[in-house]
From Swiss-Prot:
NCBIfam families: PRK10770.1. It is an enzyme of class 5 (isomerase). Transmembrane segments: none annotated. SUPFAM superfamilies: FKBP-like, Triger factor/SurA peptide-binding domain-like. Its main location: periplasm. It comes from Yersinia pestis. One of its GO terms (molecular function) is unfolded protein binding. Its EC number is 5.2.1.8. Chaperone involved in the correct folding and assembly of outer membrane proteins. Recognizes specific patterns of aromatic residues and the orientation of their side chains, which are found more frequently in integral outer membrane proteins. May act in both early periplasmic and late outer membrane-associated steps of protein maturation. Pfam families: Rotamase, Rotamase_3, SurA_N. This is Chaperone SurA. The PPIase activity resides only in the second parvulin domain. The N-terminal region and the C-terminal tail are necessary and sufficient for the chaperone activity of SurA. The PPIase activity is dispensable for SurA to function as a chaperone. The N-terminal region and the C-terminal tail are also required for porin recognition.
Amino acid sequence: MKNWRTLILGLVICANTAFAAPQEVDKVAAVVDNGVVLQSDIDGLLQSVKMNAQQSGQQVPDDSTLRHQILERLIMDNIQLQMAKKMGITITDQALDKAIADIAAQNRMTLAQMRSRLAADGLSYDTYREQIRKEMLTSEVRNNEVRRRITILPQEVESLAKQMGNQVSGDTELNLSHILIPLPENPTQQQVDQAEDLANKLVADIKGGADFGKLAIANSADSQALKGGQMGWGKLQELPSLFAERLQSAHKGEIVGPIRSGVGFHILKVNDMRGADQTISVTEVNARHILLKPSPMMTDEQARAKLEAAAAEIKSGKTSFATIAKEISQDPGSAMQGGELGWASPDIYDPAFRDALMKLKKGEISAPVHSSFGWHLIQLVDTRQVDKTDAAQKERAYRMLFNRKFAEEAQTWMQEQRAAAYVKILDGSNAQPQ
């Protein structure tokens, strides 16, 4: 939810350009708890909004309405910045520089080009940095406070994941069979009832195990009746909307209907589906290693040489990898298991370790590898493909639920903070505490 990462450079430039102009004695526009909103803040942001609206061809409300909206935005920023100070939240220079580099990249600029752009618009780089720092602070406060108010139950994730899994996209192809119980052009109620009763009976028979094709041949008025009602493959978006709506959440083997249309009652069977399941398969590795950590008692060269000697002994058959690991490995988590790391995604490992591991063949032992932990001797025991479709679907469902609840809760939280704060707007005769 780091919205500050997507700031438009022009907005920040315009918002601060006004500060560079000569100012008369600045006025306090509002008192916000222990802070203030200055008139120059409002004027600067007002100019920014107008300029950006003009550049994008958008309409803006009248100045009075716009000023009110801007003032409310600045009041909320002020409240959150004061909260950040009380909570001890700070933005390091390193994090700030990374954020600015990201903004430059998003605007297809180098940092040097950004600095030049800022200077051309009359804004110092230091002023720009502080504006971004404020954006990051308010975002951090909001994220911290709102996150703790969000509860997502496992049942919610399961339900949404199942719903998403059953959702059929317009590009999904379905293999359908169809039975049509016809109605005359202007049917009487008795005819409608009789046709509906027959359709319901057929559905019950099919669900009870009766052969769909045989019932289609015997009862359907559809042109494909003699083929057992088989319609073949087709995309959902190509079907009549009456069918598509009911098939939106269908799954393989499902009987859908009866569906009433102008010509009769329809019964559909989903024989098969393709293009709906996007299986997510990941590679997992089973590896083991021996770790030596350089220290005052063991240099890098000594650690490397010791592992080379160990590898030679293992390859010659004099000893096993597990035995050496138990004797010399300095990884307490795996040494007593003979260096076994178990099945895991290679992405969890240190990049240098991972890269060396993924170059190995099954059973192969690496040369000594240096990582941020020390020196490793690595053996790839085995690899496997694991279906992570269900896990990925649940992760996506969780993110969707979180984002939905965050958006709702953030608005509620901001309204609560605004109501709880002491705010006095100083606007001539309209000055009043809120």
